[in-house]
Regions:
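A short alpha/beta connector and helix-capping loop motif
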Residues: 23-24, 34-67
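Beta-strand secondary-structure signal
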Residues: 27, 52, 115-117
Length: 125
């Protein structure tokens, strides 16, 4: 699997062209710069990619909706809000106090963080 994963440095709009030649999942967590990078008008390759992106609405109110609108004709877009599935926690966490459990799960963010699952329509099964 490692040969199929590419992690790089600075990514330009033209770098998304590789998405046109092979199925690609873009995992994007770039602390607010997603607004500038995820623009299918500037990055044509994004039209063929599946994208999972953390959106920082706290820096730019309404950014999730703006990014979703960029992809509405070529992709399906699902919003994933922050939620804790308590049933998925390890058993040992039950031994913690409520405060310790809160501290273990808290991400120290100033506001809620939304993820968008943006799936290319021509790839949806």
């Amino acid at each position: 699997m490692a040969v199929r994963i590419s992690i790089g440095g600075t990514f330009e709009h033209s770098d998304f062209d590789l998405c046109l030649s092979e199925p690609t999942l873009v995992l994007c967590d770039i602390e607010g710069a997603e607004e500038a990078l995820l623009d299918p008008l500037k990055a044509q390759g994004l039209k063929a990619a599946d994208i999972l992106v953390e959106v920082h609405d706290r820096f730019n109110d309404g950014l999730s909706e703006e990014i979703a609108a960029h992809f509405k004709t070529s992709h399906s877009v699902a919003k994933i809000n922050r939620d804790v599935d308590m049933s998925a926690l390890p058993d040992w966490m039950e031994t913690l106090s409520d405060m310790d459990r809160l501290m273990a799960l808290w991400e120290w963010r100033i506001g809620p963080t939304t993820w968008l699952w943006i799936q290319a329509r021509d790839r949806i099964l």
